[in-house]
Amino acid sequence: MKKTYSGICSYLLLGALSLALSVSAQSGGQPLQVNVESADGSYTIGTPGSSHATLHAGIAVQLDGRWVQSSQYPRHVVKTAPVSDDLESAKEWVVAFSGLNGEPDLTYHLRAYPDKPFADIQVVVHNSTAKPVSVESIRAVAAVGNSILDLNAPAAQDRVLSDSFSEDRPNITIHDLSDAKDGMHRGVGSQLIYNRQSHESVFFGALTSDRFVTVLRVHVSPKGTDPRISAFEVDSTGTTELETDEWGSLHRADADDRLPLELTVAPGAKLSSERLLVSMSRNYHQQLETYGTIIRQLHHARVAAATPLGWWSWTAYYFGLNEGAALTNAEWEAQHLKSLGYNFFHIDEGYQYARGEYSTPDARVFPHGLAGMERQVTNLGLVPGIWTAPFEVSERSWVYQNHPDWLVHNAKGKPIHIGWVTDHNDRLFVLDCTNPGAQQYLRKTYSTLVHGWGIRYIKMDFMDDSAVEGHYYRPNTTAMEAQQTGLRIIRQTVGDNVLLDKDGSVMLNPVGYVDFGRISQDTGHTFGASKDAATGIAARYYMNRNFFVSDPDAFSVSTQTVDDQAWHGGQRPLTPDEARVSIALSAVSGGMYEIGDDLPTLGAEPERLALVKNKDLMNMARLGRPSTPVDLMTYLPQDGQPSIFLLRESPRQTILTVFNWTDRTRTHSVQLSSLGLPAKGTYSISDVFDQKPVSSQDTSALAVNQPAHSVRVFKIIDTAVPAEAPAVHAQHASSGKAGETLTFSAYPADSKAPILCYQWDFGDGVSLEGTHVTHAYTRAGTYQVKVVAMGLDGRNGEDSFSLPVSGSISTRFSPALNQRYQSNP
């Protein structure tokens, strides 16, 4: 499933990465200035023309709790050579450190690419000694010198965007450099540092996730009244540092369960770090988007799924959903929303008997089981979905009670305890995905869900909490390796046509296995829930259709409150403005679009239901592209977090979304030219919510006045650009035989007008929707096939063709030709 790394320049011919924004940014196409110091083998990376390197660093390895630095080695050898990947050449430095008595040798491979503002580095530990060594971490960046990550302006103007261990461990917050908890900004997977004065930025991002997590740390020390970066390092390491933090699953665990990662490297063997991208630019949006696209190509990301629109149970019922309420909501969705495109029906946690026993329903709430009910959901024309936490096992589950040997253990042979389901109820443990018995359990569970219950979409949660270091059945296994093993088994079991959604999990490790991925924390029936989730949705915008299709969590727009869920259940109903905030936040993600309200409650409120039926918002989701957070790193202090999002839907049409996250009235003046629109253009601007025109005395700017807790969504049409229907091209077989399953695919014929979806008419009374569809004709004939590309504002394009079908379906009994069907293992 994963692709071995072999260079990254070939993955940059991407078409249009995104809208080119004028946000004090310049093109970031210049190659970096890379050098290896002959005196000590350290490396420097900077931008052309700069008087100093932005980064000067060595490498290191942690062995048995102590750090060994490259500067300690008495010998180093530097070799350079041109290397080639699929498209471009690169210059590679190979720097080998040796001669330190009793210690393994260290080597780093550093590549720089022509015309690309990035480099990449990987460290290799070679055990040249006569005895095994135990490796805990490999450090690819150990910054040295007095000027660390200097962006040519006062460090007090730096802002730091640190990705986190998972979508909400912890919640993402963009910090000023001085706002460093315990003197450190820690990121997992990636970290962006941007200076608001120089507009320069440096970005570090993990390119691989083969064995380790990548942890980045910016250490901050005061310098008079101004902060400065005193140290910076990037490690390939285990998860224990993260799981033992205040939000981690081992925060309250016994010392025996807090195992540091220790990988044994035999004499003569090698161990590699993860590969790390280093990028420097004056366009941080481009840095993030380029990184996302590289990840998509390297890991064969599954990003082709159509955007799901539907309903989920969690914020409507939490643990309280039962059979009757589920069927009522399914019937309501089918009768009132399916015709608009809402057809996913997702049952979240609460249906199962125990975590770790997902194919056994709780008879108290689902007395007739789930198989029959999910068939009813399917018969309503809905897509059934289910929640699981694949690698968590509770003490009530069959696995824990019958096979504790299938669990991850500590050094004393006891299962590692990772907390409780809620409030010290139901202790949790970790499934060992390297154990053959546990692997068979996974196959049986997910085969039952898919083949027995008919599930077509599966959410996989709490993979962050279960990613612990420990003693696995397969020795020398890391938490990341074990997780990938489990994901591989699940994907092989369910097949390619079942949709998998990464919920609680690290970001990079599941890429290539999952179709969807949660990008921020849980939402709910409060404005605070939307506000807290918004920064994560903004910060990870570039992951949408690069890592996976984004899952922003469900929106809530009704007046429903859930009194016994104090966190996000809401003590008072959402105001109309707050309801608009919730649904607009989902729309700007460009990802999954799920209703989180009890549907009959929503249906009793026509004004709230109208939000769910708003075509412009639905089109933002169906288009599948994220709105760019224009002020991601430049938001005003008065706003407190990114507030302005831009989606260029077509050369003619743009959507501008402006949030007010504060508790007071806010006013923004948005220059249309700053959005990449012609300064002297003629525009028709309307409000997406009420469809009324927006007038402005200044045609070059848009004044946005907002009350507290509100959002404005504007549709901006450049009237100088003519409206066009999308152009579509159908790919198909030239002919077929009766009974033969034929494949049909539709593609945009150009990039001018966007396409929301494709609708097929096969000429025999059957129609389907989708980019790739199959159909079989039952009799010979020449059929007129048509595919319609649905565009914005009802403008549609089409392609048609004649398809000759010959022969007939044999009705003879031919037992010699029969073949026994075998399902996936």
Role assignments for model-derived ranges:
Residues A119, R712, G781-V785:
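Exposed beta-strand face motif in extracellular beta-rich ectodomains
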Residues E262-R282, Q706-I717:
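Short Pro-Gly-centered flexible turn/kink motifs
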Residues T307-S447, H451-Y473:
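Aromatic-lined carbohydrate-binding/catalytic grooves of carbohydrate-active enzymes
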Residues Q401-Q440, T485-L602:
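Glycan-recognition surfaces
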Residues S586-S589, E594, Y635-L677, H709, ...:
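Carbohydrate-binding surface patches
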